[in-house]
């Protein structure tokens, strides 16, 4: 499966879950289909298929052509996947993710958090912990300052990766191993 196809399915899953993924796969395989045909192929209810198709259309990932049946006067909509704008859509989604991560980093670095140690319980800001007398409101354990340095480093790493992917930051330069050793060997010869 190509990276582009994986990204399309990922976006589809975000839009309409596993059912959207099935519809996208069916459309890719068939090329073009009506909502009724897709319902038959995937086993998903027609109303759900339509809802997902409209969501994909709104996201500019699907389009249709309308054909009028001259005998009945009814219109049939033949849907297909539209990938021309996929790179633009992926970039926009990555930009949104980047903004979200930067906001999270801002929150993590500007606030001191407290936690009881139970991973199922929330971490609290200083003000919240103070309000509860530095006692966990769920289990009653004493709240200790939460070391979020690993979270901060992970956020910084992901932000850097996204900025490099988006071309907003140059990738880190790798040092060449041979250059330093030549300089050292010249200095050692002079002695």
UniProtKB/Swiss-Prot annotation:
Biased composition (Basic residues): 174-191
UniProt cross-references to InterPro entries, sorted A to Z: TF_E_archaea (IPR016481), TFE (IPR039997), TFIIE/TFIIEa_HTH (IPR017919), TFIIE_asu (IPR002853), TFIIEa/SarR/Rpc3_HTH_dom (IPR024550), WH-like_DNA-bd_sf (IPR036388), WH_DNA-bd_sf (IPR036390)
Coiled-coil segments: none
UniProt keyword terms in alphabetical order: DNA-binding, Transcription, Transcription regulation
Span list, region Disordered: 170-191
Biological processes, Gene Ontology terms: regulation of DNA-templated transcription; transcription initiation at RNA polymerase II promoter
Molecular-function annotations in GO: DNA binding
HTH TFE/IIEalpha-type domain ranges (all copies): 4-87
Domain topic, free-text comment: The winged helix domain is involved in binding to DNA in the preinitiation complex.
Biological role: Transcription factor that plays a role in the activation of archaeal genes transcribed by RNA polymerase. Facilitates transcription initiation by enhancing TATA-box recognition by TATA-box-binding protein (Tbp), and transcription factor B (Tfb) and RNA polymerase recruitment. Not absolutely required for transcription in vitro, but particularly important in cases where Tbp or Tfb function is not optimal. It dynamically alters the nucleic acid-binding properties of RNA polymerases by stabilizing the initiation complex and destabilizing elongation complexes.
Family of this protein: Belongs to the TFE family.
Subunit and interaction comment: Monomer. Interaction with RNA polymerase subunits RpoF and RpoE is necessary for Tfe stimulatory transcription activity. Able to interact with Tbp and RNA polymerase in the absence of DNA promoter. Interacts both with the preinitiation and elongation complexes.
NCBIfam families membership: PRK06266.1 (NF004910), transcription factor E (TIGR00373)
Protein name per Swiss-Prot or TrEMBL: Transcription factor E
Organism: Pyrococcus horikoshii (strain ATCC 700860 / DSM 12428 / JCM 9974 / NBRC 100139 / OT-3)
Gene for this chain: tfe
């Amino acid at each position: 499966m190509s990276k582009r196809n994986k990204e399309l399915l990922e976006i589809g899953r975000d839009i309409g879950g596993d059912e959207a993924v099935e519809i996208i796969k069916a459309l890719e395989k068939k090329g073009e289909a009506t909502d009724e045909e897709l319902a038959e192929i995937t086993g998903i209810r027609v109303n759900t298929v339509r809802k997902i198709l409209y969501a994909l259309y709104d996201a500019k990932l699907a389009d249709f052509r309308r054909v009028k049946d001259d005998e009945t006067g009814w219109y049939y909509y033949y849907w297909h996947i539209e990938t021309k704008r996929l790179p633009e859509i992926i970039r926009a989604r990555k930009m949104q993710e980047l903004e979200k991560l930067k906001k999270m980093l801002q929150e993590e670095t500007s606030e001191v958090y407290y936690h009881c140690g139970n991973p199922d319980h929330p971490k609290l800001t200083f003000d919240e912990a103070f309000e509860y007398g530095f006692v966990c409101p769920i289990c009653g354990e004493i709240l200790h300052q939460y070391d979020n340095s690993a979270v901060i480093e992970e956020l910084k790493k992901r932000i850097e990766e996204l900025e490099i992917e988006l071309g907003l930051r140059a990738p880190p330069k790798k040092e060449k191993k041979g250059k330093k050793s030549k300089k050292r060997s010249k200095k050692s010869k002079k002695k």
